[in-house]
Amino acid sequence: MEQIAPSRVKALKLDGLVPGVYLIGAGPGAADLITVRGSRILAQADIVFYDALIDLSMLDWCSSTKLVQVGKRCGSHSSSQHFINKQLVDAASKYSVVVRLKGGDPLIFGRAQEEIDALEKANIPYEIVPGITTALAASAELKQPPTTRELSRTLTLTTLPGRCAHEDHKTAIYYMARDQLSEVATTLITQGYSADTPVCLMESVSLPAQRSFACTLDQLRFGDVHNHFLDKQPVVVMVGEVYRKKLQTLFPFIESQNHFNLLQKAS
């Protein structure tokens, strides 16, 4: 695949960029596979902490930026993550726009949770800019969809077994499930998921009308989805123990009927 060098593309600036830390996904390798939003924030960064595996030409957008290589390659000691966390927190007190540039997508096996926890503990504002994860880039190169209507409607992203203390705590994310939420919840509970497993539901992801709710599987299976979401808007359903904290921070799904009514009146 022919790549477009960053030096040949001008990254337009974003208006009103909020000071803080930006965890940006650099994509699977090629510099021109970073998102437009990611490249724009890079162009405005005051300091960038970047992974070892990114295409260094991506840093051409950072003409007047301090660059710090912090990324770990496979097999290096895990304590270096603590050092990265400290660097991000320290930099946020000295610079306006701090970027942590991570290979692939920050949230897919990118150890982003440790960095998020450190930033939240220090009360530092942050934003996550998604990137193309390697599994999708490899599928594109093969010209073979990993999901097909006839053969496979499930995609598993995993690492080597035995690394997680809770291998039974699997995360499931469902596309196009807004009209089958009760069935999804009932099926998962039947398959062994606890009834109090956390669920996050997001409507119109990344759009101005985006809304997020949280509940448990038990609450979800008795909900009336048609009374909670705007007509014909896509909904993503995220299930798993990793979302436990969101039960306290997101709008409760079981109370979303009133919120829905207010939105309907406003529109």
Predicted stretch roles:
Residues 1-129, 219, 234-235:
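Class I S-adenosyl-L-methionine
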Residues 52, 71, 130, 158-161, ...:
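Residues at the C-termini of beta-strands that transition into short coil/loop
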Residues 36-41, 64-65, 115-118, 143, ...:
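Short, solvent-exposed amphipathic alpha-helical segments in soluble enzyme
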Residues 66-72, 123-127, 146-151, 194-201:
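Short hydrophobic/aromatic-enriched beta-strand-loop microsegments
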Residues 2-15, 19-23, 94-98, 154, ...:
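A contiguous loop/helix-start segment that scaffolds small-molecule binding in enzyme catalytic cores
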Residues 56-57, 75-77, 133-137, 206-209:
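Short gly/pro/ser/thr-enriched loop/turn and capping motifs at secondary-structure boundaries
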Residues 51-56, 161, 242-243:
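Short, polar loop motifs at secondary-structure junctions
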Residues 105-169, 211-214, 263:
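Class I SAM-dependent methyltransferase SAM-binding "motif I" and its flanking Rossmann-like core
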